């Protein structure tokens, strides 16, 4: 089962790229803030028509809209149970990660540590793999460096000052965070948070 948080156009584009060979089916979880295109009827209709087409070609498709993020009444345990019951083992996440903190929480609580989710770079549509266990294992030192990036793109030297760590230590941490998809850089000399990094900090209460 593949789970997607999405806006309509990139969701369709990504699934077209993924193909269908060997997949058991798709569980689609559409959610976002009030402006999310997932809530718009045309977007729903386009997605439903697309996956109806897949179903017509023999692909087992399940479409399930859950408008979750931004909803103060969201029952996270209920959502987690629905995902677990659906047999989710990998997530493919679309769009701005600022909307996806709930999804990341569910992933970290429900999926086994060897599972993974993939975050999509909106500009290139490339997929970044992020193991669930790595999310659980990030220690406080790494979180301090992430927090130091909240104010905007920052150099390695300034990050060392802001996080009260040696520059060599910060350099090693940054390499791990870049590999995990939480930080981008250096470009050319500064590092910046990715949407996934911001969502992770939201999970940790910053």
Report residues per predicted region.
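Long, low-complexity, Lys/Arg-enriched
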Residues: 1-88, 102-105, 109-206
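Short glycine-rich phosphate-binding loop at a beta-alpha junction
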Residues: 88-94
